[in-house]
Amino acid sequence: MARRYLLEFEKPLVELEKQIEQIRELARDSEVDVSQQLLQLETLAARRREEIFSALTPAEKIQVARHPQRPSTLDFIQMFCEDWIELHGDRNCSDDSALIGGIARIEDIPVLLIGQQKGRDTKENVARNFGMAKPSGYRKALRLMNHADKFNLPIISFIDTPGAYAGLLAEEQGQGEAIAVNLREMFRIKVPIIATVIGEGGSGGALGIGVADRLLMFEHSVYTVASPEACASILWRDAAKAPDAAAALKITGSDLLTLGIVDEVIKEPAGGNNWAPLQAGEALKTSILRHLTELSTLSEHKLRDNRYKKFRQIGSFLELSSQEEQLIT
């Protein structure tokens, strides 16, 4: 079994994990029945994980969202999709491996899937550019979404990126323009679009495939206009204040649900999706199918109209009168 990568706030579980592994090795190497001891320790570890993860701060949720063993776009596709065929290239200049796409079936429903893809180790992350798509990636995504629109395929996007790639070449190739065109065209698409934040959803890089009829996110995923580190550097000239920025940015599922930005927060297994990826995949599949069923009853006009209204309402606020302000203070 691969060694689990434990985050700083999970360190209280280290000793329990060692004991569990020792008992498993004992069971493999001998005929001694240790099932009862193993069950007790696993139950205790699960309870402590539940206690830790039910009280995470926004800064700690970011660590969970960036966990190297957290299920990726391809992991989820392999879990609950059939007949997956990846499609390549933007038909302009290149094929960006940081943003993947293709067609598949979910419970016999043909769909188009797009999403950012990170790597598991340094070599894979370099090849995938750490999930940071270039203009060719967003243009590839748009090409595939137009394909889905033409053949009446619902679109499912998986968001997992720290942001769009901000290198010099990407800017020269029109990074901002590529994302802006995606935003415009996704409002025009006539088929249902469901976006899911499976890890971190950062800045315009996330929004470039995030205009949707339904926006879902996992319990420990984050969705933010800028990374807390960048926000702290801009506002306070001090990246060490990232935890303060994370709290102020309202990046968690519960905050975004309250603000009306996301439509559903999907509960994660105790310890996060990396502890029970198959369980997480089943939860995501169930949620996607439920929303697809609801959206399939709407006309093309109603879909686009609702999608536009959904985004127009983001950022709305109430302005209090002087009398109301006095009552509050």
Swiss-Prot record:
- Report if keyword Cell inner membrane is assigned: no
Uppermost EC category: transferase
Extract one GO molecular function annotation from the record.
carboxyl- or carbamoyltransferase activity
Q: Report domain CoA carboxyltransferase C-terminal positions.
A: 40-294
Matching entries from Pfam families are given as: ACCA
Q: Where, per UniProt, does this protein localize?
A: Cytoplasm
Q: Pathway membership of this protein?
A: Lipid metabolism; malonyl-CoA biosynthesis; malonyl-CoA from acetyl-CoA: step 1/1
Q: Which UniProt keywords apply?
A: ATP-binding, Cytoplasm, Fatty acid biosynthesis, Fatty acid metabolism, Lipid biosynthesis, Lipid metabolism, Nucleotide-binding, Transferase
- Which NCBIfam families does this entry report, sorted A to Z? accA (TIGR00513), AccA_sub (NF041504), PRK05724.1 (NF004344)
The UniProt entry's sequence similarity note says:
Belongs to the AccA family.
Q: What is this protein called?
A: Acetyl-coenzyme A carboxylase carboxyl transferase subunit alpha
Name the gene that codes for it: accA
